[in-house]
A protein has these predicted regions:
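Beta-strand-rich domains and repeat architectures in extracellular enzymes and scaffolds
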Residues: 49-83
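C-terminal motif of bacterial Sec signal peptides marking the signal peptidase cleavage site
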Residues: 14-15
């Protein structure tokens, strides 16, 4: 039996009422002053499968978990403090850990992100700017150098590999996403940005729950869906008069906070994730952290 969940400071988007067309992109107007304090979410979530899972001890204790992902019935936890990736079975027993810090070809300096498919496990070495490709048991297969592209994050399917660039300008140009085939050959680049913008173009991305990558670009606050077939604008979030005015876009985040603009305006989307049908977007306004819930099937 489902129980109701409540998202505090949430604004639910009924796209059939609030949405309009911006070219070929759905545009949704958001007024933070009209955000609901709570809404019932029993249509989306249930507690039937919820449980506390005690994790087995690891050789190096988990001290600062920065990434937690699930795939194929396993739990993957990246510890930024120890630079280890721990993989657990669904019952919490340890499957294996990867502790391979070093300068050799099959080692890494700093794991900033990872991604799992049915066939491969990819580790992104942010400092070394390389990718370690492993099998699903963590055994090393090969190294991929990514000099010339740069990456803060990584996403993969069985057919393609994507590098996510938050805001650097590598030799390949000021683009947020670079696409490669499974053999490592460059195929495409998506979502160009202006590197001169003060507090960056965007840093928010996650999987969509259906084999795609969601990327939200500021200051336009457009959510893109990236797949092996290409890049498509999914929805544009319009904060209207509450959005940070363009004349302030050259300021960095510290300057924006010193001027008090961070409390007066919405500076963009702060978090994003999806579960297939729904896209969850978080933003800050005044003293509140609000959530936008966008239903992709109600356009």
């Amino acid at each position: 039996m489902k129980n109701a969940f409540y998202f505090f400071a949430v604004l639910l988007l009924l796209s059939c009422h609030h949405a309009s067309q911006k070219g070929h992109t759905v545009s949704v107007r958001i007024d933070p002053d009209e955000a609901e304090n709570s809404i019932a979410a029993d249509e989306w979530l249930g507690t039937a499968g919820c449980a506390l899972i005690p994790l087995a001890d690891t050789e190096k204790p988990i001290t600062n978990a920065t990434r937690l992902k699930t795939h194929g019935g396993k739990i993957y936890i990246l510890d930024e403090e120890t630079h280890c990736l721990h993989v657990f079975h669904a019952d919490g027993t340890l499957d294996f850990s990867i502790d391979r810090r070093g300068k050799a070809g099959n080692e890494y300096l700093w794991i900033s992100d990872f991604h799992v498919t049915d066939e491969r496990l990819y580790l992104l070495d942010h400092i070394g700017q390389k990718i370690l490709e492993c099998d699903t048991l963590g055994r090393f297969i090969r190294k991929r150098d990514i000099d010339g592209y740069y990456a803060n994050g990584i996403f993969a399917t069985d057919e393609a590999l994507f590098l996510v660039n938050e805001g650097s300008t590598p030799e390949a140009g000021a683009f947020h996403v670079f696409q490669f085939d499974r053999e490592g050959a460059f195929r495409n680049k998506f979502i160009p940005f202006n590197p001169d913008r003060g507090f960056g173009s965007s840093k928010e991305y996650d999987t969509d729950g259906q084999g795609g990558l969601l990327f939200c670009q500021a200051p336009d606050d457009t959510v893109f869906l990236v797949t092996p077939e290409g890049c498509t604008p999914l929805v544009h979030i319009d904060f209207g008069r509450h959005a940070l005015p363009e004349k302030y876009h050259h300021l960095n985040l510290l300057e924006i906070m010193r001027k008090g603009l961070y409390r007066q305006y919405v500076t963009g989307i702060n978090r994003i994730f999806g579960n297939g049908k729904l896209v969850f977007l978080q933003y800050h306004y005044g003293d509140d952290w609000n959530w936008i819930v966008y239903d992709r099937e109600r356009q």
